[in-house]
UniProtKB/Swiss-Prot annotation:
Keywords: Allosteric enzyme, Cytoplasm, Hydrolase, Metal-binding, Protease, Sodium, Stress response, Threonine protease
Entry protein name: ATP-dependent protease subunit HslV
Record comment: activity regulation: Allosterically activated by HslU binding.
Gene Ontology BP annotations: proteolysis involved in protein catabolic process
Enzyme Commission code(s) on record: 3.4.25.2
Name of the gene this protein is made from: hslV
Entries under SUPFAM superfamilies matching the protein: N-terminal nucleophile aminohydrolases (Ntn hydrolases)
Catalytic residues (UniProt): 12
A molecular function (GO) term: threonine-type endopeptidase activity
Subunit structure: A double ring-shaped homohexamer of HslV is capped on each side by a ring-shaped HslU homohexamer. The assembly of the HslU/HslV complex is dependent on binding of ATP.
Amino acid sequence: MSHRDSYTMYGTTILCIRQGGSVIIAGDGQVSMGSAIMKTSAKKIKRLAGDSVITGFAGATADAFTLFERLEAKLEKHPGQLMRACVELAKDWRRDKYLRRLEAMMIVADKSVSLIISGGGDVLEPENGIAAIGSGGNFALSAARALCAARDELSLDMTLEYIATAAMAVASEICVYTNNNIIMEKIEE
């Protein structure tokens, strides 16, 4: 499979977990170019809209920063309306010939909603408050779901930070494009 396939993102893992009014997004720090590790401490998580929105990206870095800028403009136009801002961004993404060629995905969250903006310009709200993207996304997603289920069924005291760290550690042990240098941002209720 080609690394230029816009629906398969290589080189990162981004995980979002929501519990009650709190949400956390975690990302690893590895930047890969082909089979070489170029950087181990990249920050793929960013705060927007006066720190009321957190977002993480997978895919081409320059493309992701283009999307960050566009999303920030949409959030300024529609303050406090994350869903609307993301839908407007997705509309632009689908209409604009330049944007359609961007190779990036994003997870975006505020105090009330978490969303995945796909490489095809779709806006998806994940079930169960857990979402993941990137090459290690399915590993982190599976681990986070298992940890949340165990926490709920056994009444265990696990924080969002603990679950995110443990799930990202699982992804970093399986996915060669993901490392264990985890950066997290959280919005508390």
